């Protein structure tokens, strides 16, 4: 039998800059499963006004917008301005562009290991 793991509060946690992008983007992995075959990582993402950020997913991810507003567009031309409570699924292989006029925050769960974003 496996016991649950309490990871503590993530409220107010600082997110490090995603320096590999020319955007005001910040991301941190809060928790990672111990399953080496099918890892799951949960964390936070913040984007502030400035350059947009384009990312190609090499894993499946769900992202819930928890604050602010982020425009999310894919390479098929679909574009949605997301606000608090909006949920997205990004399949592996999808190319997504994130932008905002002010700021937005998301909580994500991805099928990847720690630091593989």
What does each model-found stretch correspond to?
Residues 28-32, 39-57, 84, 91-92:
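Conserved short histidine dyad/triad with adjacent acidic residue
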Residues 54-55, 72, 106-109:
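Short hydrophobic/aromatic-rich beta-strand segments that constitute the beta-sheet cores
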Residues 92-116:
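Ligand-binding loop in jelly-roll beta-barrel domains
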Residues 1-39:
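A short, N-terminal "cap"/entry segment at the start of jelly-roll beta-barrel domains
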Residues 56-72:
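Short, conserved beta-strand element in jelly-roll/cupin
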């Amino acid at each position: 039998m496996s016991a649950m793991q309490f990871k503590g509060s993530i409220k107010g946690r600082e997110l490090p800059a995603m320096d590999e992008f020319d955007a005001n983007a910040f991301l941190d992995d809060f928790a990672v499963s111990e399953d080496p075959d099918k890892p799951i990582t949960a964390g936070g993402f913040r984007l502030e006004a400035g350059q947009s950020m384009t990312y190609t997913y090499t894993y499946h991810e769900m992202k819930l917008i928890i604050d602010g507003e982020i425009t999310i567009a894919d390479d098929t031309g679909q574009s949605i301005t997301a606000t608090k409570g909006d949920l997205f699924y990004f399949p592996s292989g999808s190319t997504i562009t994130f932008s905002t006029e002010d700021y937005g925050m998301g909580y994500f769960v991805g099928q990847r290991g720690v630091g593989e974003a």
